[in-house]
């Protein structure tokens, strides 16, 4: 008969997101994980498998949570343009907060691994497409509501652009401490909606 887990798996995943976000996948040792997660080596292996398995679980937990929030916001009643602005602004606010930013940086760690990990690459592609589709459907609604100018607006290209611009926020925040530059990126990115 197996033993019951004596730790909160959701909390452990949250901590793993922060550790991998702060140190990167390659820079995170097993000892770093054990120390930050507060669990025994065998518990880590029994619950998550290898370091890579834990990393994939952490990335998936982070992305699925963030993507669900974005999709929910895009599907909510009201102004789609305002929803998109809120989504981008929430990204900036998260990156301005050092504690919340740690979690965001797991995306950079994952992107570093994509060339070496086809499973992770396919997962990112699916998640990115899911968000792009959410932006697309939101933009269609915005067009129907009269929020977008121009009959010939390429909704597909605009959805792809917004998705990629949003994803680039973590990279920009990682390479500069100047949050005004991050806000400039958001303002210019969203100017296509005007």
UniProtKB/Swiss-Prot annotation:
PROSITE patterns: HTH_TETR_2. It comes from Bacillus subtilis (strain 168). This is Uncharacterized HTH-type transcriptional regulator YezE. One of its GO terms (biological process) is regulation of DNA-templated transcription. It comes from the Bacteria. Residues 29-48 bind DNA. Keywords: DNA-binding, Repressor, Transcription, Transcription regulation. Residues 6-66 form the HTH tetR-type domain. InterPro entries: Homeodomain-like_sf (IPR009057), HTH_TetR (IPR001647), Tet_transcr_reg_TetR-rel_C_sf (IPR036271). The keyword Transcription regulation applies. Transmembrane segments: none annotated. The keyword Lipid metabolism does not apply. It holds the Pfam family TetR_N. One of its GO terms (molecular function) is transcription cis-regulatory region binding.
């Amino acid at each position: 008969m197996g033993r019951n887990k004596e730790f909160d798996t959701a909390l452990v995943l949250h901590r793993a997101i922060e550790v991998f976000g702060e140190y990167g996948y390659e820079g995170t040792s097993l000892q770093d994980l054990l120390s930050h997660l507060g669990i025994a080596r065998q518990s880590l292996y029994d619950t998550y498998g290898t370091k890579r398995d834990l990393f994939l679980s952490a990335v998936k937990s982070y992305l699925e949570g963030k993507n669900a929030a974005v999709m929910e916001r895009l599907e909510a009643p009201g102004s789609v343009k305002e929803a998109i602005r809120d989504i981008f602004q929430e990204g900036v606010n998260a990156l301005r907060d050092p504690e919340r930013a740690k979690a965001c940086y797991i995306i950079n760690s994952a992107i570093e691994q994509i060339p070496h990990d086809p499973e992770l690459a396919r997962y990112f592609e699916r998640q990115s497409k899911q968000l792009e589709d959410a932006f697309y459907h939101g933009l269609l609604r915005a067009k129907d509501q009269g929020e977008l100018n121009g009959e010939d607006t390429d909704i597909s290209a605009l959805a792809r652009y917004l998705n990629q611009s949003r994803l680039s926020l973590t990279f920009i925040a990682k390479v500069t401490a100047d949050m005004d530059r991050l806000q400039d990126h958001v303002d210019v990115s969203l100017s296509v909606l005007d």
